[in-house]
Structures are given as C-alpha cells and as structure tokens.
C-alpha cells in the first residue's frame, strides 16, 4: 500500500500528485485513448510574443498570479497579446482538488496583505478599463477570502475610480453569510460564480462543491444587488448531455442570473478528467439561441469561450464566441 501524501504548506501539488488526493479516483488517460481535436479546436499563436512576455514580467515583478497561466487557459496568448489578463488573488494554491482544473492543490500560505495595493498599481500601470479578479478556493480562511476580495476592489477603485471590476468568486462553502455580508458592502460591477457542469456529474467534476449551494450564492447576491449583473458558466464535453446543459441554464435564470458562458472543456494533462466529446460550433450556437430565448441578457457560447474571455465585451453585450 502506498503511503499517503503529507502536504507541506506552500507546496504546489499538480497532475498525478494532485489526482492522488481526490477520493473519486481518475485513471490517467493513455495517449491512444485521447480524442483527436477537431479542426475548430486548433489555436493560432500570435507572431509577436513581446506583449505576452511583458505581462508575464509585470506579474512576476509584483508577485501576482493570473488564472490564465495557473489554469493553462487556451486563450492565454490571445488575451495577453491584447494586454488583458484575469488576476488570481489569494495565492496560487487551491484548497480544493477538482480533477478538471490545472490550478495546483495544497496547503496555501497566509494571504499577502500587500496584494491589494500591488494589484491596483499593476492594473493602473497596464491602463486597464475593465478587470476580472478571481481566486483559488481558500477553505482555510474564516471568510473564504471575501475580505481580501473587498480589499482588492477598494484598492483598485482608489487608483482608478472609473474602472469596471468583475469578480469571479469561489463558493465560500460554509461561509456564505459572512462572505455576502462583506461583498455586498463593496460590490463589483459584475458578480460571477461558475457552476462548471451539470449536477449529475458534480461528485466527479467538483468534489467538495454543491450545485444548489452555488445557485443560492448567485441568488442571494442578486437579491442584495438587483442592479448588478450576475454571471455563471459551464464547461461542456465532460459527459453531460445538451438537455442537461439547457436545464442548468433554466436553473440559473430561476436564480436571477443574467449572463452566461459556455465553453469546451480541454484536458490539461492525461491525469485530469478526459474529454468525452467535442461540442460543435453549431451546437454552441443552438444553445446560445436557447439562452437568449430564456431571457439571459448576454450569452457567450463557443469552443474557446471561458468565463473571463473578452469579459469587457461580454459586459457590453457584444458578440463573443
């Protein structure tokens, strides 16, 4: 019998080490079992990478993280080349261990008290008019990291009062009341929390999360701030059906969510959950039509769509796919 992994504080556990810590075991995918990517999933890299390297250097200089890098987002080159990034606060080690996600798991260190100021200065230096701030899950903190979110929002607005801020928050498991008390005092311009997938697959895809809890978080923030758009997203291709996706969309509307993102799941490594199917661009268009018919004010649906992909355009209701 193999010895259990003893996690050291501040150490990132990825791939096989991370998956070994998940109760619901996932067998590594053999190369011959991988689904071949269709033509529509091919990414063209920009010819000039100087802007990309500049953003990475600014992140390193200030000890900041982007979810673009930490989660191996397929749109990193495009977004960085356009001077945009989704900032990930509260460190780069997550207390959860979702088998679809490439963010490292482990025992995180204490939050950096100077991060809000460093984040605000970096955003000001980049001249951003719209920024997305997300975080790892911090189940080790009494408020789940809510006060740190609020401090970051305040610091960013102090540097640039006209900036638009979207927060992509964790579920604040067991801490919803405390977190909402904090976040409703310093609300963002868009409140985003992703359901990720359909409830039937939650035990496999989001161990430690609860579908109805996530819906309630979105609903309660909307009740406190009816004027602020709420947003959620799903990855598709993990074994769900289109009918199940549409039912989740209905649940989101019933809980007051007004903005939707749907994108194709991509397997970060062979140790993560495998892709079960590639959803065609035509199917994404059909689901977008369903979403708009349900009353979503905006729905970004396409193979490369992620919740923060061209988030500024999404917030303006412009076409993103």
Swiss-Prot record:
Task: Supply one GO molecular-function term.
Answer: lipoate synthase activity
Binding, [4Fe-4S] cluster 2: 94, 98, 101
User: Which reaction(s) does the protein catalyse, per the Swiss-Prot or TrEMBL entry?
Assistant: [[Fe-S] cluster scaffold protein carrying a second [4Fe-4S](2+) cluster] + N(6)-octanoyl-L-lysyl-[protein] + 2 oxidized [2Fe-2S]-[ferredoxin] + 2 S-adenosyl-L-methionine + 4 H(+) = [[Fe-S] cluster scaffold protein] + N(6)-[(R)-dihydrolipoyl]-L-lysyl-[protein] + 4 Fe(3+) + 2 hydrogen sulfide + 2 5'-deoxyadenosine + 2 L-methionine + 2 reduced [2Fe-2S]-[ferredoxin]
Q: What PROSITE patterns does the record point to?
A: RADICAL_SAM
Origin superkingdom: Bacteria
Q: SUPFAM superfamilies given for it? A: Radical SAM enzymes (SSF102114)
Subcellular location, record wording: Cytoplasm
**What's this protein's family per the entry?**
Belongs to the radical SAM superfamily. Lipoyl synthase family.
Protein name according to UniProt: Lipoyl synthase
Q: Which organism is it from?
A: Klebsiella pneumoniae subsp. pneumoniae (strain ATCC 700721 / MGH 78578)
Q: Which gene encodes it?
A: lipA
